[in-house]
UniProtKB/Swiss-Prot annotation:
Along with McjC, necessary and sufficient to process the inactive microcin J25 (McjA) precursor into the active peptide. The gene is mcjB. GO terms for cellular component: cytoplasm. Its main location: cytoplasm. One of its GO terms (biological process) is antibiotic biosynthetic process. Pfam families: Transglut_core3. This is Microcin J25-processing protein McjB. It is found in: Cytoplasm. It comes from the Bacteria. It comes from Escherichia coli. Keywords: Antibiotic biosynthesis, Cytoplasm, Plasmid. The keyword Nuclease does not apply.
Length: 208
């Protein structure tokens, strides 16, 4: 399993330690991320991270884009869609409890370990199904008694869509000065539960 995920934001290097569920920032090292020899020559203390299995993510397309740090808001349910039955809501809530409890207790490592690797295809006729599953999840998510944040919501949405044979990916983005991390879901390279230009605002440190 990958131990570290790395990316850069402006001049900063950001490291995600999956096992310890923590982020680290190394100022002025970001520009050397893709030049390993130069990076380790100038920052020899980073050799520890490169001796383990690691992944290098993508850099924000426009780090000058303003990004308002604010509390994450749960997506509003789509009132134009048919609401799922109470039984389905109950089953969905149990899944959310399971995902959020494990994320709260076991951290990022559990997400990587439990990630399913099946290859699935996406077609445009699945857009209605995606909208419906987002709406259904939003209806019950406020009842979650465990960790409720963008990571939990996005991971739950990814797993729900995967179970419907949709190749959804959890994406984790970061920025620095001040530090901020955020999670969203993409299908076919498109953001489905957040602003479409998230990759312009944040550097992607992990895709699951």
């Amino acid at each position: 399993m990958i131990r570290y995920c790395l990316t850069s934001y402006r001049e900063d290097l950001v490291i995600l330690d999956i096992i310890n569920d923590s982020f680290s920032i190394v100022p002025d090292a970001g520009s050397l991320l893709k030049e390993r020899d130069k990076l380790l020559k100038e920052f020899p203390q980073l050799s520890y991270f490169f001796d383990s299995e690691y992944h290098i993510g993508s850099v924000s397309r426009n780090s000058d884009t303003s990004f308002l740090e604010e509390r994450w808001f749960l997506p509003e349910p789509d009132k134009t869609l048919y609401k799922c039955s109470l039984f389905k809501r109950f089953i969905l809530l149990l899944k959310v409890f399971y995902y959020s409890w494990n994320i709260e207790k076991k951290g990022m490592a559990w997400i990587f370990i439990s990630n399913k690797k099946e290859n699935r295809l996406y077609s445009l006729n699945e857009e209605h199904l995606i909208r419906k599953e987002i709406s259904n999840l939003s209806i019950i998510f406020h009842l979650n008694i465990f960790k409720s944040d963008c990571l939990t919501y996005s991971y739950a949405l990814k797993r729900i869509l995967n179970s419907r044979n949709i190749d959804a990916h959890l994406v984790i983005g970061v920025r620095t000065q001040p530090f901020y991390s955020h999670s969203w879901v993409e299908v076919g390279g498109q953001v489905i539960n957040d602003a479409p230009n998230m990759r312009d605002k944040l550097s992607v440190i992990a895709e699951i």
